[in-house]
Amino acid sequence: MSAPIFDPTPEDIQNLLAAQTHIGSKNVQVQNIPYVFKQRADGVNIINVGKTWEKIQLAARIIAAVPNPADVVAISARTYGQRAVLKFANHCGATAIAGRFTPGSFTNYITRSFKEPRLLIVTDPRTDHQAIKEASYVNIPVIALVDTDSPVEFVDVAIPCNNKGRHSVGLVWWMISREVLRLRGALEDRNTEWSVMPDLYFYRDPEEPENTEEAAEEAATEEVVETAAAEAAAATNADNWDVAPDAGAGAADWAATDDWSESAPAPVAA
């Protein structure tokens, strides 16, 4: 008998563990207790990745049920999730709001950024609280990536995961995108691998060098040049041991003192 098609593969579980999606925080909201697998000796709570996978499947079904993909709004005020929501919007046709959420975007129709979405997805309920609050005023269902200490008020579907790590946030958004495309039929078979790698959803520091190997080679080359210059200078100094060092041009004999008693007194102004 074949396994259910919606069950996670060993590769999916390995990816979740490698991205540290199961690492929670030391505090737990009472609503998030069912998602906690156990608590480590240092007080950090471990999230059950099985619950994470179930909620990813549920969220993907809800997203795929929206007829117009543009009516799904993905929001991330947290820096680590901004790249992920932009890629999710690109692959699934949703609307992305990366960065600061303009207050009144869901409630004030006079503003230019006014939207009437049918579904809202947020990266962190704590940083995206303004969007969740406005969604509750206009009856918009909310899907949120929640940690063990995240508030879940006005959140309809909570995906338990580590929403503070760049790899964890990117991987969860990547899995949601993949499952949505599978349900829509964009991917031929569930056994077919998606050509998009999870690394594309990970946050990248703009100041970080693009290729670490090239940066390491440049650093090694500079070190070799500096070492050769130091050795050449040491060899030059070793050949001139017989030459006495030159005295400084501005050097003076501070030990010698003058007899001030013999000096003429300064003239006194009348």
Swiss-Prot record:
Pfam families: Ribosomal_S2. This is Small ribosomal subunit protein uS2. NCBIfam families: uS2_euk_arch. Belongs to the universal ribosomal protein uS2 family. One of its GO terms (biological process) is ribosomal small subunit assembly. Component of the small ribosomal subunit. Mature ribosomes consist of a small (40S) and a large (60S) subunit. The 40S subunit contains about 33 different proteins and 1 molecule of RNA (18S). The 60S subunit contains about 49 different proteins and 3 molecules of RNA (25S, 5.8S and 5S). Interacts with RPS21. Residues 207-270 are annotated as: Disordered. Its main location: cytoplasm. It comes from Yarrowia lipolytica (strain CLIB 122 / E 150).
